[in-house]
């Protein structure tokens, strides 16, 4: 009985990844938020995405998030429609008024949103301003890191209880 209580207390030292917040992920990523304006060309947006190895850019006008442009938007609204990206504007193909989250959202809440809505990116808003963007990759990385930590804690507990 004592061991199970000890295991529970050892594992409670760190919150689970599903309890980790978006804010903690953003702090680990750093505070750089790439963005683009609605009057930029799609070509400029794609160039920025390629240069920065990202799949989406928040679209900001006068400091306010007005949309998001993704690789998926480009594929569906430019390539499949036979349009020319050097002349298309971001505002013409962006997803307007995207679903947003706050730094207080948990990883599990975000995973539910991206799974149910089939999103890959969630802009993060704090006090009315864009403060970051979370990708499905960020969420998965948080879960994997937490699982690795849990495994390490269990291995330490087990090996401490039994001589090698």
Describe the role of every protein-language-model region:
Residues 1-164:
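Tandem CBS (Cystathionine beta-synthase) repeat/Bateman regulatory domains
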């Amino acid at each position: 009985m004592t061991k199970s209580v000890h295991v529970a207390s050892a594992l409670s030292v760190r919150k689970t990844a599903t309890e980790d917040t978006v804010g903690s992920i953003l702090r680990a990523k750093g505070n750089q938020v790439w963005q683009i304006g609605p009057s930029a060309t799609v070509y400029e947006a794609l160039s920025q995405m390629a240069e920065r190895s990202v799949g989406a850019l928040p679209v900001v006008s006068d400091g306010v998030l007005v949309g998001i442009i993704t690789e998926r938007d480009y594929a569906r609204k430019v390539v499949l429609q036979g349009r020319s990206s050097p002349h298309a504007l971001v505002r013409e193909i962006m997803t307007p008024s995207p679903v947003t989250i706050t730094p207080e959202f948990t990883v599990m809440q975000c995973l539910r949103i991206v799974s149910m809505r089939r999103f890959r990116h969630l802009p993060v808003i704090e006090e009315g301003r864009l403060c970051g963007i979370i990708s499905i990759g960020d969420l998965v990385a948080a879960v994997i890191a937490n699982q690795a930590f849990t495994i390490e804690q269990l291995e330490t507990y087990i090996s401490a209880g039994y001589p090698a």
